[in-house]
Amino acid sequence: MVDFSLRKARNNWSKLSSPGKTRQQGSPTKLKSNAYEDFVSPRDTLQLPEIGMKDRRKVGTSMQRRLSVHNAKYIPPPIDYASAPALPTAVELPVRDNSLLSSELMKPNHRRPPVDIYGGRSLREILSNPQFQAKRFVHEKLGDATALEIDHFASNLNHLSQEIEQEIKSNINKSYNELMQVNKELAVASTELKDLRSKVQQLQVVMGQFTAMAEKRLLLEKEHFRQSNTSVMTTKSGSTGSGLLPPVKSGAAKKDRSSVIILEKIWTNELSSLFRSVEGAQKYIAPAPGRRILLESNDWMEINIATLKPLHATRIFLLNDMILVAVCRSDKKGELVANQCCSLRELTVAEESNYTLSFHFGNKHHSLYRSRTPTGYTALLNEIKSAKDELRDIYQAEEDNARKLRDSFTYLQSTQQSPSRDISSPARGHSRQRSLGTLQNTPSRASTYQENLLQNISMSMHTRSRSGGVNQTAVKLNLVYEELEELSVPVTRMNFGLAIKKLHSIENILKGITAEAEGEVMLLNLLRMKCNQTRTLITQKLTHVINTEYSDANKLESSTKSLILLGMPAEALQLFLHNRSNFIQDLVLQVGVHDNSNSYITQVAVIRCQTIKKVAIQFQKLFEGTTAKYSSVLVSWCNDEVDKHFFLMKKQLINDDQLTPQAIKISRKQIDELKSVGMDFVYKLDDFLKIHSNKIY
């Protein structure tokens, strides 16, 4: 049992510290070489004493008694400050004589200056030196160092070790992540290489087809050149024949339709794969010339109209004139069955919420289809709109061509002065009259008749040679006829830049042609009429694109530029500004009505001012060089849009709502940004604030 009595501890302490006892101890006769030879670590021998509960309470009670000091309440003695003696003056203070101090006491205490172990460099630089020697460094730098410096060096060395370990771990982790990223990129690269290999194979097939087309074109050119030489010799020998009769052998070049054949072959293969993958598709869709697949989307589900719950997954196939909806079979996974099919002319599409489309088919059947992704929803909706617009343009163009051809042929027949202008036989004339009588109901017959008429006129002119040589006017007219035939391809594909370029080239050729023969004059008039019809068709398509395109700014800008190239800059500017006005109105409607009028006003201000600024920048690009001529139209439009904005603000402030300084600040900032494009409408805001000053906080 350990006794914690403080009395005994004090007695023991006095015994150990007594100088008399120390002198009586014998001094060691032999010095040890190692002072710590018999040293035993306290951690190995020291043990905590075991104290019982009773002794622990006893010690605690005794400690409390010693530490508890009870002093009486201290009361300071009274001091009379009035009777205190005065303080001595500075003259009476004794002067200290420093000369009595010893010189040794006056010397400052010089300490040992700290030693720079690292020599101005970091410890990492010293250890990373390839010529570093540890023993030499310790001997030179730490030989005379103090314990504090050695401890500081050891601490730095330990920190450096931990830092290096952390860097090693970080580098290992970084290397691992980079390796994983490289593996992912390698997987992507391998997939892309496989796709590239398949594309290269397809390209080789296409290049082989192009080679065959080129060889066939060369053969046709050689044959045409040989036939033209033969026709020249024939016209020299048979100049006494009638010029209106067709030649025995036509000298017109056969047109190479290889590219069209290849394209139709690709479309046929796509339809064949559709028939193989969708059961029952052949019942609804029949192979037809020009019929092709525009889009195949499998991100759709059919929705129950009553419960709005998904029924089954569907796949939608959009053709250029039809739409097919196929569903997955429940018994066989992966196989498709045709469910609905309808012509695009009989299909009605309505947009619903949550990426849902409502289809009204021609058989009065109504279905709801929901897309899993917004991109699939937007892609199908845009393709349906473009396909329906293209069909509408085709039908409208056929009807317009039929009407214009009927009127033009009626005018040409009424202005003929002699029966020699009829280049066809009576039987052909009778059939032509019957065709003209039904042009309005059958526009395809009108186009066929026009082509036959142009071919007959061009073929008959090969035999007309007054000087015995080839008629250059006939050659140019035939060239223009072929160019007009090829012009329909870029117009149908909406490639307006190429179409306008070819149209200008054809018009320049027609301006330089001077026809003297009657057949040449008639063909020239027909070509000019067809050229004007093509120009009108391109104008209608561009007008439709500019009026309906809101999302794609590049497409809108290119369409406006194409309409300017057609020689209608004023109309193009009006359509462009009208499109932007509708775009602003749609964005304002999307913002909706808010309970907070200030938030609504600030959002509308940002939308309108930023759109006006962008329109001004696009105007400078579109009308580069002629901005001064049409700038007044732009300024008038901008002024109207700003007036619309303030009118909208006035409507919002009809109630008890008030404008906050933050809303005014944002509106002023947006209007100030218009100064960068030359528009200053700050005075309108100031006038508005003066009129409605009672509506401001």
UniProtKB/Swiss-Prot annotation:
Region annotation (Disordered) maps to 13-33, 231-250, 411-445
Q: Which GO terms describe its biological process?
A: exocyst assembly; exocyst localization; Golgi to plasma membrane transport; protein localization; protein transport; spliceosomal complex assembly
| Alphabetical list of InterPro entries matching this protein | Cullin_repeat-like_dom_sf, Exo84, Exo84_C, Exo84_C_1, Exo84_C_2, PH-like_dom_sf
Subcellular locations according to the entry:
Cytoplasmic vesicle, Secretory vesicle
Principal localisation: cytoplasm
Query: Key word Coiled coil present in the record?
Result: yes
Naming one, the record's GO cellular component terms include: cellular bud neck
- Assigned keywords, A-Z: Coiled coil, Cytoplasmic vesicle, Exocytosis, Isopeptide bond, Protein transport, Transport, Ubl conjugation
Q: Which Pfam families match?
A: Exo84_C, PH_EXO84, VPS51_Exo84_N
Q: Where is the composition biased (Polar residues)?
A: 13-32, 411-423, 434-445
Cross-link Glycyl lysine isopeptide (Lys-Gly) (interchain with G-Cter in ubiquitin): which residues?
Answer: 169
SUPFAM superfamilies in alphabetical order? Cullin repeat-like, PH domain-like
| Coiled coil feature spans | 149-212, 377-407
Task: Write down the PANTHER family for this protein, in alphabetical order.
Answer: EXOCYST COMPLEX COMPONENT 8 (PTHR21426:SF12)
- Complex formation: Component of the exocyst complex.
Q: Which family does it belong to?
A: Belongs to the EXO84 family.
Q: What does the protein in this record do?
A: Involved in the secretory pathway as part of the exocyst complex which tethers secretory vesicles to the sites of exocytosis. Plays a role in both the assembly of the exocyst and the polarization of this complex to specific sites of the plasma membrane for exocytosis. Also involved in assembly of the spliceosome.
Record-given protein name:
Exocyst complex component EXO84
User: What organism, scientifically named, is this protein from?
Assistant: Eremothecium gossypii (strain ATCC 10895 / CBS 109.51 / FGSC 9923 / NRRL Y-1056)
